[in-house]
Swiss-Prot record:
Primary localisation category: membrane
UniProt-recorded name of the protein: ATP synthase subunit delta
Organism: Pseudothermotoga lettingae (strain ATCC BAA-301 / DSM 14385 / NBRC 107922 / TMO) (Thermotoga lettingae)
Alphabetical keyword list: ATP synthesis, Cell inner membrane, Cell membrane, CF(1), Hydrogen ion transport, Ion transport, Membrane, Transport
InterPro entries named among the record's database cross-references: ATP_synth_OSCP/delta_N_sf, ATPase_OSCP/dsu
Membrane topology of the entry: Peripheral membrane protein
Family: Belongs to the ATPase delta chain family.
Function: F(1)F(0) ATP synthase produces ATP from ADP in the presence of a proton or sodium gradient. F-type ATPases consist of two structural domains, F(1) containing the extramembraneous catalytic core and F(0) containing the membrane proton channel, linked together by a central stalk and a peripheral stalk. During catalysis, ATP synthesis in the catalytic domain of F(1) is coupled via a rotary mechanism of the central stalk subunits to proton translocation.
Originating gene: atpH
GO molecular function, one term: proton-transporting ATP synthase activity, rotational mechanism
Binding partners and assembly: F-type ATPases have 2 components, F(1) - the catalytic core - and F(0) - the membrane proton channel. F(1) has five subunits: alpha(3), beta(3), gamma(1), delta(1), epsilon(1). F(0) has three main subunits: a(1), b(2) and c(10-14). The alpha and beta chains form an alternating ring which encloses part of the gamma chain. F(1) is attached to F(0) by a central stalk formed by the gamma and epsilon chains, while a peripheral stalk is formed by the delta and b chains.
Protein's cellular compartments: Cell inner membrane
Recorded GO CC terms: plasma membrane; proton-transporting ATP synthase complex
UniProt xrefs under Pfam families: OSCP
Amino acid sequence: MRYSQIAAKYARALLNVAVELEKTEEYGDILAVVVQLYQKAKQFFDDPTIGAAEHVDRITKFINQIGAHFDKPFWNFLKIVFEKRRQSVLPAILQYYKNMKIESEMKVPVFLTTAYELSEEELKVITDFVRKYTKRNPVFETRIDESLIAGVVIECEGKTFDASVAGRIRNVTRHVLQREVM
């Protein structure tokens, strides 16, 4: 829990700067590249004998090599992350950043797990449900899980709505077992 609070604070700080500079998309994209780079070279970036500025300079060189760049405020953000040895929470910072950005646009992030690819009509029904429930437009992050058999699991605003066949089977099984115990 502590790391998620830390990640949320860093994400909020970066988003505030990005909004002020009108660079929310750019910062999100660069942060995603930095997270990928960190995950691929984790051993190097977690080496305590290398200073924070050198870590950030290496990231800067890599970003420049792929044809992108970032400004001084983003560089300062990364330097603080590495000075405080918080680089291990970069993936969580990215996730919080994405979600906070969506919320700042008066939308709601929704994690959707389905048994198969949804049709436009099915997606519209789910969109309408989420709008009715949250009073905001959803932004879906979808993943396929065939173990659901059919149906969907919707996660938003800290709540989970399980409308999957696997979820219903679990509920029926639980109720049957509870009756046997009594």
